Amino acid sequence: MYKPLPDTITIKDSGIHGLGLFAKEEIPSGTVLGMIHFQFNGELMRTPLGAFGNHSDDPTCEKFWDSLENGAGWYLRTKRDIYEGEELTWTYTLYKVTI
């Protein structure tokens, strides 16, 4: 069954901007949270997980390209242990996907 967000994450008001992603419980470093972007018909599409993340110059997460069990795309992984209630952020960059 498709789930737009992992069970460990919720969407709440953010002090950074608008809404953000927050940990509902502690999340260990190196945890793959899910896909944030994928390519469809030549277009880069954003998932719900990718839609609510905020930028930080000191992010708690990092994005990486991979072809995991759910398909090829940009995925999100924690860079360090995340505490309950902490906002999940990553560094926004422009990127071109070539498959």
Which positions does each model-derived feature cover?
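Conserved catalytic SET/PR domain of SAM-dependent protein methyltransferases, capturing the structural core
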Residues: 1-99
